[in-house]
Amino acid sequence: MGRAKKVVLAYSGGVDTSVCIPYLKHEWGVEEVITLAADLGQGDELEPIRQKALNSGAEISLVADAKDSFIKEYAFAAIQANALYENRYPLSTALARPLIAKLLVDAAAEYGADAVAHGCTGKGNDQVRFDVSIAALNPNLKVLAPAREWGMSREQTIAYGERYGIPSPVKKSSPYSIDRNLLGRSIEAGPLEDPWTEPLEEIYVMTQAIADTPNSPEYVEIGFERGIPVSLDGVAFSPVDLIDRLNQRVGIHGIGRIDMIENRLVGIKSREIYEAPALLVLIHAHRDLESLTLTGDVSQYKRGIEETYSKLVYNGLWYSPLKEALDAFIQQTQQRVSGTVRVKLFKGNATIVGRKSANSLYSPDLATYGAEDQFDHKAAEGFIYVWGLPTRVWSQQVRTP
C-alpha cells in the first residue's frame, strides 16, 4: 500500500519538484499526483510549467494566480510590521510559503486528496514553513516530503529525473539555486557557499550594478494609508502594479541587494543573496512615516514586536496564535500611519528626504529654536529634577562617604 492515494504537490517546474512526480508514484506508490503551481509574479510563463508537470507524469496540473493575495494579505502585513529578519532580510521568499501552503490545503479539499507534498530538502527553512503552515490549516492532512527522504545528491536527482524524461535546466556553469517572486529573488549554493567569494554580477536580475546606474538621482513620493502603500508620486496603483513599478524604479539605481550570513531555523548558518528593491524601500519609508505619526512609546515598543514578528514569519509560524495576536497590535498602531514619504534614489542608496502627514505629531512651534519657539524653557528645570531624582537618591546612598 502506498503512502497516499491522491497527492497535491507544490510545483515550481524545477528539478526537485519535477522529480517528485515519478518518485511519488514509483517509489511511494501514489496513484494520482496533482500539481499546483502558484503564480506569485516570478515572471515565468506558467503554461510551459503546467505542461512540464503533465509530461513528468502528473494527472492534473493546476496554476493559481495568487499575485494579488500575495501582496495584499502577506507583503503589506509585513510592511506594516517593518519585518526584517536579523534586521536585514525582508522575508521576500518566506512570505510566499504560508500562501502556497493555503493553496495546497484548499486544492486538497477540492480534489479529495489525502495528502499534500513539497520538494523541500531536510536542510532548509521551507520544509518547516510548509509543514507547520499545513498543520495549522488542516492538522489531519498528511504531508509528504520526498526530497527530505530520498537521500540523493543533486547529480543523482538530475539523473533520476532523466530516467523519466525530465530535462534539467541547471548547467555546470550556473549551479545556483534561485527562487523568485514579485517581491524579490533569493540566490544560494554553488560558489556562494564560500562566504569569502564575491558574487558575480551575472546572478543579479532585479538590481543594476552601481557602475551602470544613472548619474542623476531620482525622487519618488510613496503614499501610505494606514500603513499600506497606495500610490507613487500621487498616482494610485493596484497592489501588484505598485510593487512591480517600484521594483523597476528602485532596481535601476542599484538599490535592494543583500549579501548575508543567515541563521537558519534548523541550526546552520547559510550564505544568502537577496534582491528586494521595492520591499526594502517600502519598509524604510514606512518606518520613517511611523516616526512622524506614532507616539514615542508606541514606536519604541513596536520595535520589539517587529523583531518577534520577523522571527515568527521566518520560522514558519504565520498561522500561529502569537502571530495573530501581534497582527492585532500592529493593526491598531497603523490607524494613523497615513501620509507621504519622499525618497531619493541614487547610486545604491535610498535616502528619506521628506515626509508629511495630516496625522503628524511633529510640531514646528515646539521644535523650532527660532523666535516662534513656544516651548516653555522654564519648565525644564523642574522636569530635570524629578527625572533625575532616582539617580540622585542612589548616588547619595552609594557614592556619598
Curated annotation (Swiss-Prot):
Keywords annotated in UniProt: Amino-acid biosynthesis, Arginine biosynthesis, ATP-binding, Cytoplasm, Ligase, Nucleotide-binding
Name of the gene this protein is made from: argG
Family designation: Belongs to the argininosuccinate synthase family. Type 1 subfamily.
One Gene Ontology biological process: L-arginine biosynthetic process
Binding residue positions for L-aspartate: T121, N125, D126
InterPro entries: Arginosuc_syn_C (IPR048268), Arginosuc_syn_N (IPR048267), Arginosuc_synth (IPR001518), Arginosuc_synth_CS (IPR018223), Arginosuc_synth_type_1_subfam (IPR023434), AS_cat/multimer_dom_body (IPR024074), Rossmann-like_a/b/a_fold (IPR014729)
Binding-site list for ATP: A10, Y11, S12, G13, G14, V15, D16, T17, S18, A38, G119
Native source organism of the sequence: Cyanothece sp. (strain PCC 7425 / ATCC 29141)
Name of the protein: Argininosuccinate synthase
One cellular-component annotation, GO: cytoplasm
PROSITE patterns to which the protein is assigned, alphabetical: ARGININOSUCCIN_SYN_1, ARGININOSUCCIN_SYN_2
Xref: CDD domains: ASS
Compartment annotation: Cytoplasm
Keyword Membrane carried by entry: no
Domain of life: Bacteria
UniProt-listed Enzyme Commission number(s): 6.3.4.5
Phylogenetic lineage: Bacteria, Bacillati, Cyanobacteriota, Cyanophyceae, Gomontiellales
GO molecular function, one term: argininosuccinate synthase activity
Enzyme class (EC, first level): ligase
Catalytic activity annotation: L-citrulline + L-aspartate + ATP = 2-(N(omega)-L-arginino)succinate + AMP + diphosphate + H(+)
